[in-house]
A protein has these predicted regions:
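N-terminal secretory signal peptides that target proteins for export/translocation
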Residues: 1-35
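Acidic/proline-rich low-complexity IDRs
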Residues: 5, 15-18, 25, 42-47, ...
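Residue-level detector of transmembrane insertion/anchoring sites
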Residues: 5-8, 37, 50, 227
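Extracytoplasmic metal-acquisition and chelation regions
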Residues: 25-26, 42, 55-302
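Secretory targeting and sorting signals
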Residues: 30-59
Length: 302
């Protein structure tokens, strides 16, 4: 018997169709091809004037005068999480606009002219793009310079974060959805938080954190050290996805308290689906005897 991992399932599979969350949890690995962390390309935003972008930044983490919360998401998974938590019917009085990596904007929820709350989301990564390195576009750099919230995965997944925030003058709140920013958190969280006090932006790790696992693979050819100390692909576990969704929901509630009930109900519904997904995954794997399991995967993340 052969166990095909979730990321390799057919998109039209009845099992996957049962769960709206499957596109994020099960199919996401196709967005991250294998890449050495040392192969970073220069960020496109470095060509911009950092002082000019910094002048656009602000430190507010709640809705501005127009009642708009501006958010940026680093990965496709986080972009999908936020979309599912913020997408509601017109009765919610929440207007939500999501701009993808292709620059196209989609509208969800209440009519913008009638809504009492507004949320805009800029998604940095495109499908099939590496989550480790990213060249910011001019529009993305501008969005980050004005953002109230910058949602990231953490556990050292996104190597481009420092360059992105430094070059844009980001002064909002970086929400670490996994609850673990990186290996430094594991080594000495108190010391890491002390260092962050000097940063021009705040860091919010939420109330929950994922269970980090040591990176099981040896160094790549020609390298003396492994690419990671801990496995950053945390969202491939539904249990870890629950942590991320919970932390995202809490951050959105804090930024737009008048929509707290909407976000909370969407988080509860999403978590319920993730729990069912976890049960299905465990049952599927356990149906094959352990000594006969063969794993086919497109990435070293499962």
């Amino acid at each position: 018997p052969v166990v095909v991992p979730f990321g390799m399932q057919q998109e039209g599979s009845p099992q996957l169709a049962k769960f709206r969350v499957s596109e994020t949890i099960l199919g996401s690995m196709r967005t991250i091809p294998s890449m050495s962390r040392r192969s970073a390309a220069a960020l496109a935003c470095l060509a911009l004037s950092a002082p000019a972008l910094a002048a656009c930044g602000h430190s507010s983490t709640s809705a501005d005068a127009a009642g708009t919360v501006k958010a940026v998401a680093s990965t496709t998974q986080i972009c999908d999480y936020i979309t599912q938590l913020a997408s509601g019917d017109a009765s919610s009085n929440l207007s939500f606009d999501r701009t993808g990596a292709d620059g196209k904007t989609q509208h969800f929820g209440a009519d913008a002219a009638k809504a009492t709350s507004h949320l805009t989301l800029t998604c940095l990564l495109a499908p099939n793009a590496s989550a480790h390195e990213h060249d910011m576009t001019t529009a993305q750099s501008k969005a980050l310079s004005e953002a109230d919230l910058f949602f990231v995965s953490g556990v050292d997944l996104e190597h481009f974060l420092d360059s992105a925030v430094d070059s844009t003058g980001f002064k909002g709140t970086m929400v670490v959805t996994s609850g673990v920013a990186g290996a430094a958190d594991v080594d000495d969280l108190a010391a890491q938080k002390k260092k962050e006090e000097a940063k021009p932006y705040k860091v919010d790790r939420g109330s929950a954190k994922v269970e980090v696992a040591k990176w099981p693979f040896p160094p790549e050819e020609g390298e003396s050290e492994p690419e990671f100390r801990f496995d950053p692909h945390v969202w491939t576990s539904p249990k870890n996805a629950i942590v991320q969704v919970t932390n995202i929901g809490a951050a959105l509630e804090k930024a737009a308290p008048d929509q707290a009930g909407v976000f909370r109900s969407h988080v509860d519904a999403y978590v319920a689906k993730l729990k069912k997904l976890d049960e299905w995954a465990a049952g599927s794997l356990s149906s094959v005897p352990q000594d006969k399991r063969v794993l086919f995967t497109s990435h070293d993340a499962f």
